Regions:
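Secreted glycan hydrolases and related glycan-binding modules that recognize and/or cleave
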Residues: 1-265
């Protein structure tokens, strides 16, 4: 049987009044996972749509957890990280449990605690431990977690807690920059290639192999196979722009078709 590549999306949920594009039901089917930007505040439409996606399309619905902003808030307010992180993690677990979500995607772009500053490293270690202590039991009970960060943030002994490692590749200007990031994750960080996703943004362009400017999402979909093969593609900002004649929708559908061609009827 042919390999299935994951196509996952970030969705800015919780809006209404702007038409169908703002509802989860407007997602193309065959999406493997949708990360809800505002999973702490689900509206009635979200709550109606989530079980439909899960049941009819086997789509995993994940809570988006922004570790970067929590750390920055702690630093700017002079509080200890655990003072803000502990309640935020509790809120995440409650949202997952109460609303039947499949897990969470943890995004973090800060210092990963491998530098020379002992105080910084100690604070990062504490933050990471709080996170792992909270999500490891959930992972053992079947919830799934993505990591949107430098994979080295998670020690090797804890790597199995995460189903997918998502590389932020939207700033990659071409295939060779992309390949470099992929190879670093596989050969330096030791992440299995089938757990790895790259990220494309429908609003961004990149340079193709002939130095022409092309839309990032369709080009990156091809690179999942050409630069890998790796696990799949994460598409950012899916609800941001359905107005350009549904370009985002078409590109998302196109990426699914590129990676997992459906048999012709």
């Amino acid at each position: 049987s042919r390999k299935h590549y994951a196509v996952c999306v970030r969705f800015d949920n919780g809006h209404s009044g702007d038409g169908e594009k703002d509802f989860l039901r407007s997602m193309p089917d065959s999406i493997d996972a949708v990360i809800l930007e505002n999973a702490a505040t689900l509206n009635s439409a979200d709550l109606e749509d989530i079980p439909v996606l899960q049941t009819n399309f086997a789509t995993k619905v994940l809570f988006s957890f922004n570790l970067t902003s929590i750390k920055e808030n702690a630093e700017s307010s002079g509080q200890e990280i655990k003072t803000l992180l502990a309640p935020a993690l509790e809120q995440m677990v409650s949202a997952i449990t109460d609303n039947g979500l499949d897990g969470a995607s943890i995004s973090y772009t800060g210092d990963i605690g491998l530098g020379n500053n002992a105080a910084v490293n100690a604070s990062i270690t504490e933050m990471r431990q709080l996170l792992l202590d909270k999500i490891t039991p959930l992972a053992k009970n079947g919830k799934i977690f993505f990591l949107e960060s430098n994979p080295l943030f998670i020690p090797e002994a804890n790597r199995d807690v995460f189903t997918r490692y998502v590389l932020n590749t939207t700033s990659s200007k071409n295939a060779s920059q992309l390949r470099l990031l992929i190879n670093e994750a596989i050969y330096y960080a030791g992440i299995p290639s089938d757990k790895l996703l790259i990220t494309g943004d429908p609003e961004l362009m990149t340079t193709d192999n002939n130095d022409g400017l092309v839309s990032q999402v369709p080009f990156f979909a091809i690179q999942v196979i050409d630069c890998g093969p790796i696990g799949g593609l994460m598409i950012q900002n899916v609800a941001a722009d359905y107005s350009h004649a549904n370009i985002t929708y078409k590109e998302t559908r196109g990426a699914i078709q590129t990676l997992n061609p459906s048999p012709l009827k």
